Amino acid sequence: AVVITSIDPTHHDYVMKTLAEEKWCFCEKPLSQNAADCEDIIKREQEIGKRLVQVGFMRHYDRGYAEMKRIIDSGEIGKPLLIKCCHRNVAQGPGFKTENGVTNVAIHELDICRWLLGDEYEDVQCVKVRQSSNSNKGYDNPQVMLMRTKNGCFIDVEVQVADGYGYDIQCEVVCENGTVKLPDPYAVVRRSRP
């Protein structure tokens, strides 16, 4: 197996080389920097006829998110209506660009919300809000992403990569008859009728 954790622009070529050898591959996100290269990887993997590539989305394996998914899938608190997410980091590295807020940070929320809901996105927009003085010059920070799924669930994601205090991940799913929330420290809180 091959583990790819190199800089983003190298991911596509390295993954394609591992596929040429038909080796298992774990690739840190993003898989590539554009949709065409991602489709190229998927096409090659399909030609081989088995899944060989896994992208570094670790939240599916997190105990808290797994419990949130169990509650949502059970239907115990009704169908999901909206999700509120927050992803904050203490600082950004030199050269960090606005698009990295999506491809390296918010991508985790995009992935986990899709997984929690078992639904696809229909509409996505990114909104520029009042900017933090803690950001690299020319970088939009924070960013807010607003999304709607095909089944009508609304999702808002706040991404801030220079909050000055630490790593902070939050997720709350508001359903018809209650909520399920991943607060600090990562333990699930459920609120609903008894």
Placement of each model-derived feature along the sequence:
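Rossmann-fold NAD(P) dinucleotide-binding segment
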Residues: P9-E28
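A contiguous active-site-proximal alpha/beta segment in oxidoreductase catalytic domains
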Residues: P9, F26, S32-G93
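Short glycine-enriched, charge-decorated loop/helix-capping segments at active-site entrances
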Residues: K97-G101
